[in-house]
Structures are given as structure tokens and as C-alpha cells.
Amino acid sequence: MARSGRERRDQEEEAAVVSVERVFEGRVVPGWKEQVTLRALAVSALLGAMFSVIVMKLNLTTGIIPSLNVSAGLLGFFLLTSWTKLLDKAGVASVRPFTRQENTVVQTCVVACSGIAFSGGFGSYIFAMSDRISDQSGEARDEHNIKNPSLGWMIGFLFIVSFLGLFSVVPLRKIMIIDYKLIYPSGTATAHLINSFHTPQGAKLAKMQVKMLGKFFVMSFSWGFFQWFYTGGDGCGFMSFPTLGLEAYRNKFFFDFSATYVGVGMICPYLVNISVLLGGVMSWGIMWPLIEHKKGDWYPADLKPSSLRGIVGYRVFISISLILGDGLYNFLKVMTRTTTALVMQVRAMMSEPTLPVSGGGGQTPEETFDDKRRTELFLKDQIPNWLALSAYVVIAVVSIATVPRIFHQLRWYHVAVSYVVAPVLAFCNAYGCGLTDWSLATTYGKLAIFTVGAWADASDGGIIAGLAACGVMIGIVSTASDLTQDFKTGYMTLASPRSMFVSQVIGTAMGCVIAPSVFWLFYKAFHDIGMPGSEYPSPNALVYRNMAILGVQGLGSLPKHCLDLCIGFFVAAIAVNLARDLAAPKVARFLPLPMAMAIPFYLGPYFGIDMCIGSLIRFVWDRLDGARAKAFAPPVASGLICGDGIWTLPQSVLALAGVKPPICMKFLSRTTNIKVDAFIAKLPSS
């Protein structure tokens, strides 16, 4: 028995090192035009719209968005295999076989489309320009610093700024992928996933995963529909259930029965979920109650509840200080690693007459075969550098002329300077993302808020100028790193760079129309969107607005002792990150993430409780059956997220049609209930 077990392990180890490309060696790789098919684009549009709704919902609730790459790849595989089988059974002749290259095109297009729902700033810089967020920030109302959302200008703005990043990194694709051999962990993981789908064993597992995803999609959608019946007023429904008591509920400690964030908790690392809950306990459990006892001393007692000169100011600005401290540390860390790695790469290339394709010794012949095969096809379909550079210049000129027409507060020279600096930042972000899998696009955007906001003037619309510059920078930098990730995925699945680029361009174009349309649906259907305590509070919009105010007006408007607390938390964020990097791995995995801790400082810990319940489910599942949990936890989580997210569409339609939920389920204390009963008893009977 021992021998047979050892032989089985040896066979498994031998199978593990078998070349991926030798498995697919007998299959013809289609040309790039045959990879970008009409059926692939149709499926991409469907999935892109679905994921845009999901990302938009997450964006407008907490801003925590997990990776949906697994779901996109899995659903793309399922829909296209089902499509080809149906046509085959219908007797349609010459049905083109579904290949992993086509699967990669779908994956790229879907992620590019849904990515605009995040980088488009609908939960951050664009919505931060509105009067609704301006009124919450406590600033004096100034029409120069307000621009309300409108479908026309949002679509136009996104089309102008979202393509420059793609053209900025095209000339560097060979350097990034082949010469420097950057890992791009997410792109590599996606490629492994797609390659596995197209093996017999992987296809069988994928069918089971899709079945599991579909089951939990239906459950989550049905649960959202059921909950809707009980939300017939403010503070009604399961999302206002005081599961831990009324006092805890007043301090945002409750489970709101959100299938979305239970699913998010199952996907996110344990440390992220624990950090969110810890931040909620520290802020809403300790700090805010203590500061509220200082009402009348630290801040006036007669302020509106939403005033930034009161308790809300502490919540917002301390949260911002944590975010900025964490962002600054990671920015310097990634830039240091990027610079060091670049210097080492250049020295190595100068000292060697040729750069070995295999990447050095110690690799097996099978790995060398994979590298040679992939490099050969990656270099086959070139994208002319002159075309990319010319397109960048043309789009930049058009953008410099048109963006100031959309945002008259932003001058043409602000945009021009952004486009001169952007390619360097796009390269740094793409390179750093390849090393660490960490995109700093939002950090570069925040830098633009402060620099352009300070450059402009408050009386001249500096707040809008800073926010618009943030959008320009994020639009360029985020799409650049996304494209290089896709080049890595295409490299490992033998998809042509041209098909990757074309699908990214098409997906981005889809996103520039779909994402604003989805946001507009939310904006028109839910009239309290962006308001504290609503279903869609959009916390990042207020954070970005106040960053712009700080950039323009300075620190004079902060409440008493708020600046001292902000400095303390800013330094603490840097110190915790430094401790995480210096500590041993066994210790570092218990140190919290400041960025995750910052999110509940303003919103409250309720969604952190949801996420920790998701973590607990995943932890127990891992303990009981680790192999099954690894295979099926992501589809289950994706089903929970997608079902609840897609329910938002019919919910929006019902709201637009004026159909209101028939029941209000609300919870009262015993003493309040006695008063309500007494009041009702005095009413005349009908």
C-alpha cells in the first residue's frame, strides 16, 4: 500500500511538471482575426453589462470590489461552449471550435468593460462633483465647484480619457513580458484558469463550478426579491435588522443580511475582512462615542448631524489620513522596488550580449519549450509602435482641446502637463503591478487632486479642477496596467497581442457607454443615492470631495484636535505597513491593513460583519473539505455577489415605474412601541 501510494504521488508530481503547451501542441492556434469573433464580442457585451451593474453596486455601497476575473472567465467559458454545442446540435455546418484564445478575448473584453465602472469614478471623483456631495461637505455653496452628473458629458469624458493609457504601454509590451519577465500574478492566474478549462479534466470541473454558481445566483436573486417586499420606508427591511441590539444598531453594529458582502468575504483574504471589522470596532465602538462626549467642547453642539465641523468631520478626515498614509507608504515602496528592479534589469542587459529566452538556468526542458512557443507567437503579430505613438499624440491633442470644454475650471495646460507626465506614471504603475500585483492608479489620482487643486484656485473652481484631473490620471494609469496584465494572460494562452489589444479597446469602448448608463439608472431610480444612511451612500465620493477641499483650502476648516488625530493616524498607517514588511511572515499575517481599516471609519462596521461571516463560512469549509472549498468557494461567492447585484436591475425598474414595496418591517424598543401603540389607539377608527 505504501509503495502504491508513493508511486501515485510520483505520478502526480510528474504530471504537475508536464508542459502546458505540449498538452495543446496538436491544436492549431487561430489567427488574431479568428480570435476576436462576433460571438465572443456578443458574450462579452452581455457579461460586461452584468459585471458593470455588480461593480457599480459595490462602488456605491462601500467601494470594496473583489476580483471578478474567475467569474468572468468561468461564465465566458460556459456561455461559449453552450453556444457552440447548441449550434452543433441544431445541425449548423462549419461551427468554429471554441478555443482558449477566444476565451481569453472574452475575459479581456469583459474585465475592460466592467473596469470602467470602477475607474470611471462614479463612486468617487465624478459623483464628488455633484451638489449632493457638496452639501454634505459643509463648504459654502459655489456653483464654480459643482458639476452634476449628466449622461452626455460622462460618456464623452470617458471616451476622451480612457484610451490614452492603452496606447502609452503598447511599445513596452515586449520589454515587460519577455525581456523583464514580469510575473503579473493576476494575469498569470487567469491564464492558468483559462488553460485548465480547455483540458478534459478542467472542462468537467468548470461545468460543475458553473452549476454551483448558477444555484447560488438564483438563491441570492430570490433573497433580494424577498427582502424588497419589506422595505416600504426609511429604515425598513432586513438591512435595518438590529441583530445585536438597538444600541449596537445605532452604532452601526448589525448584520444586514447582504448576500453580496457575505460573498465578498468568502473571496477576500481573511486579513482584509478582519482589518475591516477591527477598523469598525476601533472607530464606532471606541473613538466616536468618546468624541461625541466632547460635544460642546471640541465642536459646537448645535451643528447639523451631517456637518463636517462636527463628528462627521472626525470620521471623514481621520479616514482620509489613514488612506493617504497607506497610499504614500505603498507608493514609495512600489516605486523603490520598481526603480531597483529596473536598474538591475538594465545592468544585466548591458552585461550580457544576448538575453536568454529561458530566463536562466535551473528550468526544465518542458518550461523552456513553453517559453519558446509562447515567445514565438507573442512576437508574431506586432502592433506598430509608430501607430501607438501617433494615436497617443492625436488623442492627447483632442483631449487637451475638449476636456476644458467639459470642465471649464480645468485649463488646457493642466491637461497638457498631465499627458506629459502620464506615460511615465503609466509605465511605473504597469511595472509595479507586474512585480507586486498592486495597482496604484487611485494613488496617482489623489496626487493629481492635490497638485492640480492647489495649482488652480478655490475661487476659480479648484475643487472641480482637482477632481477632473484625478479622472484624467486614473483613466490613463489604470488602463495601462490592465492592458499589460492582459498581454501576460495572452502570452500564456497563445492569444495574439493584437487580439488582446483589440479586445481591450472594444471592451473599453463598451464600458464608456455601459458604465455611465448603469450609473444613470442608479442615479434616477434611487433618489437618496449618496446620502448617509441610504442604501447607496457612496462614501468614497465624500472622501474625494474633501481631499479636493484640503488641496485647495488647506487644513483650516478641520474641527478641534482633528488635525492632531489625523497626523497620528497618518503616521500609524505608515508604521503598521513598515512593521508588516519588517516582521517575520508568521507575525506579519496578524498585522492589520490600514487601508481596509479606514473604510468603516465613515460607513460603520456592518458590512465588515457580513464579510467576516463570509470568512467564517470559508474557514469552516476549508477545514472540513479543503480541496472542495478551493474548487467551489469562488463560484459560490460569485453566485451570491452576482445574484444580489443583478437584482438591482429589476429593483431600479420598479423604482422608476413608481412601484413601492408593500410592507415596512421596522424594529422599535419596548418603550417606544408602548408610545406608538398608545398613539395609534387614540386615532379615530375608520
Curated annotation (Swiss-Prot):
Principal location: membrane
Keyword hit for Transmembrane helix: yes
InterPro entries: OPT (IPR004813), YSL-like (IPR045035)
Membrane spanning residue stretches: 36-56, 60-80, 109-129, 151-171, 212-232, 271-291, 316-336, 383-403, 415-435, 461-481, 501-521, 556-576, 597-617, 639-659
Keyword annotations from UniProtKB, A to Z: Membrane, Transmembrane, Transmembrane helix, Transport
A molecular function GO annotation: oligopeptide transmembrane transporter activity
Gene Ontology CC terms: membrane
Membrane association type: Multi-pass membrane protein
Subcellular location: Membrane
Superkingdom classification of source: Eukaryota
NCBIfam families tied to this protein: OPT_sfam
Function per UniProt: May be involved in the transport of nicotianamine-chelated metals.
Family: Belongs to the YSL (TC 2.A.67.2) family.
Full protein name: Probable metal-nicotianamine transporter YSL10
Organism, as annotated: Oryza sativa subsp. japonica
Lineage, uppermost ranks: Eukaryota, Viridiplantae, Streptophyta, Embryophyta, Tracheophyta
Primary gene name: YSL10
